[in-house]
Amino acid sequence: MSHLDNGFRSLTLQRFPATDDVNPLQAWEAADEYLLQQLDDTEIRGPVLILNDAFGALSCALAEHKPYSIGDSYISELATRENLRLNGIDESSVKFLDSTADYPQQPGVVLIKVPKTLALLEQQLRALRKVVTPDTRIIAGAKARDIHTSTLELFEKVLGPTTTTLAWKKARLINCTFNEPPLVDAPQTVSWKLEGTDWTIHNHANVFSRTGLDIGARFFMQHLPENLEGEIVDLGCGNGVIGLTLLDKNPQAKVVFVDESPMAVASSRLNVETNMPEALDRCEFMINNALSGVEPFRFNAVLCNPPFHQQHALTDNVAWEMFHHARRCLKINGELYIVANRHLDYFHKLKKIFGNCTTIATNNKFVVLKAVKLGRRR
């Protein structure tokens, strides 16, 4: 846990999933402090919109203003709810919207934590363009190293005149005034042909490797299991290309597409609808934190390309949680398949959790591993 003192309230905040006690990662950053400082002497009129509030620092601080928390991360929503409870703040004080929803009209203040991907930022700025006014105070913040010329140009192009502040504690802010500059419409998704198939893959803004097949997925697809039955999970499904391939290779199986990103799940659904519509009755689509709340001993197989970062921080906490959830939800003799960068050494992590691990394939960058849930159902 970490403490954030600001002009609105003193907060105790924690990350979600929780990090280990040896190397704890902080649940807020200097950009959060810097953003809140700008509102110290501001009379807030109209709705408050907060975008990409990773662990709820801004939402908790501004809870008395009934803010809208907007983003593309279910884990961030869970983190915000947990930190509201931790600080004795009514959860209903914050209203949660995903980035594909319509934003509230005529906001008084918009606070933006600049996301990792420029595509997501553009989608969010275009959505804001439909609701902000010249009187809306628009402030974005991030580590100074993460604000580039392209970031500022995007604000200018979509919303209007943009300036940046001096760095403070290695953070920098962007101030923007809306003046409705001319803007060409942009498609909601980016599409490309999947090599070796007649499929067209459609990606929403925040999907990993948006403009083509990432090399890890390409390697994984060469080693996917075939002729499975029962339920299979594409965990952390992204655009669903792994699950789509599983549907094709395992015609007797049902595939459950799971991701914490609403845009990823929407992309997966769209890709099944447009490429294998006849398989929709063998699909389930789930926005979730890994397999939280899913009953144990349910699945025959889980396939996963786990992330090794959360927002801008490098961490294996999300991967660890995925592995533990997979073990709990697999049937006896059910199998977990993962692809990962070789340097992450997930072989020993899986062996610790499952008691076994087998290398299926490897190249100079990636490894495909399999672990089996052994033992008896109790």
UniProtKB/Swiss-Prot annotation:
Paired cysteines (S-S): none
SUPFAM superfamilies from the UniProt entry: S-adenosyl-L-methionine-dependent methyltransferases (SSF53335)
Subcellular localization: Cytoplasm
Pfam family name, one: MTS
Keywords for the protein's UniProt record, in alphabetical order: Cytoplasm, Methyltransferase, rRNA processing, S-adenosyl-L-methionine, Transferase
EC number of the protein: 2.1.1.174
Gene Ontology terms: cellular component: cytoplasm
Keyword hit for Nucleotide-binding: no
Alphabetized GO MF terms: 23S rRNA (guanine(1835)-N(2))-methyltransferase activity; nucleic acid binding
InterPro entries reported in the protein's UniProt record: DNA_methylase_N6_adenine_CS (IPR002052), rRNA_m2G-MeTrfase_RlmG (IPR017237), RsmC/RlmG (IPR046977), SAM-dependent_MTases_sf (IPR029063), Small_mtfrase_dom (IPR007848)
Catalytic activity: guanosine(1835) in 23S rRNA + S-adenosyl-L-methionine = N(2)-methylguanosine(1835) in 23S rRNA + S-adenosyl-L-homocysteine + H(+)
Transmembrane segments: none
Similarity comment text for this entry: Belongs to the methyltransferase superfamily. RlmG family.
Function: Specifically methylates the guanine in position 1835 (m2G1835) of 23S rRNA.
Protein name as it appears in the record: Ribosomal RNA large subunit methyltransferase G
Lineage: Bacteria, Pseudomonadati, Pseudomonadota, Gammaproteobacteria, Enterobacterales
Gene: rlmG
